[in-house]
Amino acid sequence: MAETLRWGILSTAGIACKNWEAIRNSGNGVVTAVASRDAAKAQQFIDGCQAEVPFEDVPRAIGGYDEIIAADDVDAVYIPLPTGLRKEWVIKAANAGKHVMCEKPCAVSHADLMEMTDACAANDVQFMDGIMYVHSDRMPKLRAALDNPSNVGKITRIASAFSFCAPPEFLAGNIRLSSELEPAGCLGDLGWYTIRATLFVMNFEMPKSLR
C-alpha cells in the first residue's frame, strides 16, 4: 500500500464530517470519494467539508455504495451507516480488499459482528470501530497508572454511566431513535463507550456478572 491511505466515505452522516477532518489532520490520509444513495447529496457533503477542511484534490461524489467499494483509488472505507445496515457493506468492503473503519455499535448481534470481523480477517484487512478515545495519548498513561499497584488496588466493581440531554429536534427525527435502524438503542449508542472503558480498565478481562 502507498504511504498515503486513500479513504472512501460510505454515507453522508453528520459524524462523517468529523472524520473527514480527522483524515485531513492525520498527515497520511486523504479522502478520494464520498458515496451516498444520491450523488447530488454526496456532492453537497463534499462541498460543505471542502469549505471548512479542504483537500488539495477534491474528492469525487458517487451515487450508490457499490462503486466506492470497487474503486481502485480507495484503500479503506469509513462506514457510518445505521447499525442495521452495516453488516452487508462491511463484508462487501472486506471482500473487495478494503480496510474498514465502522461506526459503533458495529453490529446488531454478536453473530453478525463475528461475520464482519471474520470477513476482514479472511481478506487480510484491518477492522476498526469508531471509538476515538482509545487512540488518545492519554490511554497509555492511564494504562501505566492502572498497572502501578501503588496507585490502584484490586478492582472488584466498576460503575459507569454516560448520558446527554437530547433536544426536541433529536427526539423528533434522529435515526438513533429508530428501533429498525438502531435496534440496540441508547445501550448500543452510549453503552459502547462505557463498556469499552470498563474493559480497558480491566485489561479486557471479562466481567463475572453484570447488573
Predicted features along the sequence, with ranges:
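Rossmann-fold dehydrogenase core element
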Residues: 115-133, 153-157
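Alpha-helical elements of Rossmann-like donor-binding domains used by nucleotide-donor carbohydrate transfer enzymes
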Residues: 18, 44, 64-67, 76, ...
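Short, Asp-centered acidic motifs that coordinate Mg2+ and/or phosphate
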Residues: 33, 76, 157
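Predominantly a Rossmann-like dinucleotide-binding segment in NAD(P)-dependent oxidoreductases
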Residues: 133-211
